Amino acid sequence: MRHYEIVFMVHPDQSEQVPGMIERYTAAITGAEGKIHRLEDWGRRQLAYPINKLHKAHYVLMNVEAPQEVIDELETTFRFNDAVIRSMVMRTKHAVTEASPMVKAKDERRERRDDFANETADDAEAGDSEEEEEE
């Protein structure tokens, strides 16, 4: 079986359907003896340019190992599903399991935000103790 990277974008009004879509697609892959190496739901993001007068879309990334028949079936499903506004299936040489740059950047921002919040809380506590000493 070959390795594939699949990215599909869902209409922003259909975002609540994304978990069900992911479940159906993963069931099709695993049902055909395939493996899912990475699954990332990037959520609703701004598009680089408008597609069908839309400026946002819900992104999903999957790295899978599956037979060609399943990939053909997925591509057909993407093509005839009105909620999917764009999709791309690429064959890769190896399984990709590490987090994508999108998720890494989000994690780094979260860590920086948490560090800043902790520093701010520590500074506030230090300021409160100094005021108590002055009184």
Swiss-Prot record:
Record field: compositional bias (Basic and acidic residues): 104-116
PTM statement from Swiss-Prot or TrEMBL: 5 different forms of the protein, varying only in the number of C-terminal glutamate residues, were isolated. The sequence shown is form bS6-6, which is the longest. The first two Glu are encoded by the rpsF gene, the other Glu are added post-translationally by the RimK enzyme.
Signal peptide: none
Region (Disordered): 98-135
Alphabetical UniProt keywords: Acetylation, Ribonucleoprotein, Ribosomal protein, RNA-binding, rRNA-binding
Domain of life: Bacteria
Cystine pairs: none
GO annotation, biological process: cytoplasmic translation
Residue ranges that the Swiss-Prot or TrEMBL entry lists as coiled coil: none
Gene3D superfamilies per record: 3.30.70.60
N6-acetyllysine, modified sites: K93
Any one of the GO CC terms: cytoplasm
Acidic residues bias: start-end ranges: 120-135
PANTHER family: MITOCHONDRIAL 28S RIBOSOMAL PROTEIN S6 (PTHR21011), SMALL RIBOSOMAL SUBUNIT PROTEIN BS6M (PTHR21011:SF1)
Entry's family note: Belongs to the bacterial ribosomal protein bS6 family.
Subunit structure: Part of the 30S ribosomal subunit. Interacts weakly with uL2 in one of the 3.5 A resolved structures.
Job description of the protein: Binds together with bS18 to 16S ribosomal RNA.
Name of the protein this chain belongs to: Small ribosomal subunit protein bS6
